[in-house]
């Protein structure tokens, strides 16, 4: 699907899409072609661990988060060095990929909080916009339909904290 999306975007921009090695979906191993609840839950649990810094955890028979980033980020760095850091280049680069890889790479590059990245999936054909800033760093200027600041969804607060406290059998004074 990413190739088809790239072809549509390329057609709109009158530019041929270019396939770049390293930019592709997460290799999910034994979870490939499965969409049952167990497979989705297993993927989501491991993917969450990646966002929380446990990048060496592999998908069953598939990639680790480190392997995804090790193939994906150098391509983005090369594009940045070749085009975006060149003061004679005055345009944008569109990289078409898959949501899980995009969210992981963008969160790492731009320092987007794990909870936000996990709470905000990208719909088909949605994008994340990164812009280069100083010292090789990136800033995330759009995530799907959202713009900064990027905060995780607020945790639900009990609707009746006073009533819940009154019903408690524990003496709040000690």
Q: What function would you assign to each model-found segment?
A:
Residues 1-47:
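Phosphate-coordination/substrate-recognition cap region in phosphate-metabolizing enzymes
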Residues 15, 26-38, 81, 85-91, ...:
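Acidic, low-complexity terminal tails and accessory targeting/binding regions
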Residues 1, 101-102:
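Glycine-rich phosphate-binding loops at beta-strand->alpha-helix junctions
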Residues 1-9, 55-75:
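Loop-to-helix element that buttresses phosphate recognition and phosphoryl-transfer chemistry
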Residues 98:
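Short, conserved phosphate/pyrophosphate- and ester-handling motifs at nucleotide-, phospho-/glycolipid
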Residues 8, 104-108:
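Active-site signature of alpha/beta-hydrolase-fold catalytic machinery across serine-
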Residues 46-67, 164-171:
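Short glycine/proline- and acidic residue-enriched helix-loop micro-motifs
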């Amino acid at each position: 699907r990413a190739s088809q999306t790239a072809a549509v975007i390329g057609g709109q921009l009158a530019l041929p899409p270019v396939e770049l090695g390293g930019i592709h979906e997460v290799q999910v191993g034994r979870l490939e072609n499965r969409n049952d609840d167990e497979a989705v839950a297993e993927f989501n649990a491991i993917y969450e661990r990646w966002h929380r810094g446990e990048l060496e955890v592999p998908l069953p028979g598939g990639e680790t988060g480190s392997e995804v980033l090790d193939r994906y980020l150098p391509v983005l760095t090369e594009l940045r060095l070749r085009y975006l850091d060149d003061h004679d280049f005055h345009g944008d680069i569109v990289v078409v990929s898959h949501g899980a890889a995009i969210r992981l790479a963008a969160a790492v590059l731009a320092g987007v909080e794990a909870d936000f990245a996990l709470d905000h999936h990208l719909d088909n054909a949605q994008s994340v916009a990164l812009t280069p800033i100083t010292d090789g760093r990136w800033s995330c200027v759009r995530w799907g339909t959202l713009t900064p600041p990027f905060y995780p969804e607020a945790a639900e607060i009990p609707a009746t904290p006073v009533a819940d406290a009154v019903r408690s059998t524990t003496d709040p004074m000690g």
